[in-house]
């Protein structure tokens, strides 16, 4: 299933369900293509929603390499039984629809970092840490637990719980409505103004024909942290929903 969003903004991206994220056979490529309709907030903290359509493009080589429009790229460079770790590269899309007049429009960001994952009998525990090389230029991280499986011959369900963090450069740029002051960020910093969120996700996939599935995702996150006095933050709840079709090749 889709790996947990590192913070609520990532929940605005298209969620890809369990059916489209199963491990491929060892040393074999699998490709998933599809399209989903998505309902999401206009921007982080907005109570208003919009509906759009997004492509689903995923490629996996066994358990070693994963490429996705949603989750970026990752390579499990180190694998030892149920444990794996390696580098990740992700693209963060900023959502700037319906911003208040004069609000700072945060740029999209490319984030580079690493992940560590542990498979257990009941699910997967994963943590990630990334540095934004463009955009807000700060650090972010998340911790998630994913589980799921076959509940009927043609039906799979999945779930995720997650907590996420981003440093104060993100919250300054977004809720402060301005570009954060430039400073060197070689290592993660934890400050009183950092951004936190906690959330959960439910996935469902119903096989319609061999290699074709109807998929649906419902995701919710709660913005935590300090009480920012920002016209953007009209609600701390971020809900998204998507439904569509995916074809595996």
Regions found by a protein language model. Name each.
Residues 31, 63-67, 83, 122-126, ...:
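Repeated loop/turn-to-beta-strand initiation elements of outer-membrane beta-barrel proteins
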Residues 33-35, 57, 69, 85-89, ...:
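Membrane-embedded beta-strand positions of outer-membrane beta-barrel proteins
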Residues 1-28:
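Cleavable N-terminal export/targeting peptides
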Residues 21-68, 73:
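Short glycine/proline- and aromatic-enriched beta-strand/turn motifs that initiate or cap beta-hairpins
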Residues 37-43, 61-63, 89-95, 120-122, ...:
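Transmembrane beta-strands of outer-membrane beta-barrel pores
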Residues 29, 49-55, 59, 81, ...:
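Residues that define the transmembrane beta-barrel architecture of outer-membrane proteins
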Residues 75-76, 134-235, 247-249:
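Outer-membrane beta-barrel transmembrane domain signature
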Residues 43-49, 67, 79, 106-107, ...:
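Solvent-exposed loop/turn segments connecting transmembrane beta-strands
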């Amino acid at each position: 299933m889709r790996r947990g969003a590192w913070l609520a903004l990532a929940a605005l991206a298209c969620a890809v369900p369990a059916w489209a994220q199963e491990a491929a056979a060892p040393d074999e490529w699998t490709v998933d293509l599809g399209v989903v309709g998505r309902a999401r907030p206009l921007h982080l903290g907005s109570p208003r929603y919009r509906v759009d359509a997004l492509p689903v493009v995923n490629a996996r080589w066994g358990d070693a390499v994963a490429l996705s429009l949603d989750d970026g790229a990752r390579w499990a460079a180190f694998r030892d039984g149920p444990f794996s770790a390696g580098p990740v590269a992700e693209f963060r899309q900023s959502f700037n629809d319906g911003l208040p007049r004069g609000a700072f429009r945060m740029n999209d960001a490319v984030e580079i970092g690493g992940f560590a994952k542990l498979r257990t009998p009941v699910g997967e525990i994963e943590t990630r840490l990334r540095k934004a090389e463009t955009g807000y230029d700060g650090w972010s991280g998340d911790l998630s637990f994913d589980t799921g499986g076959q509940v009927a011959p043609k039906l799979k369900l999945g779930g995720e719980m997650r907590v996420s963090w981003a440093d104060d450069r993100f919250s300054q740029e977004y809720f402060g409505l301005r570009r954060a002051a430039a400073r060197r960020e070689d290592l993660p910093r934890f400050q009183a103004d950092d951004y936190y969120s906690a959330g959960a996700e439910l996935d469902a996939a119903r096989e319609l024909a061999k290699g074709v599935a109807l998929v649906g995702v419902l995701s919710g996150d709660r913005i935590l942290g300090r009480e920012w006095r920002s016209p953007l933050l009209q609600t701390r709840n971020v809900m998204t929903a998507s439904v569509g079709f995916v074809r595996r090749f």
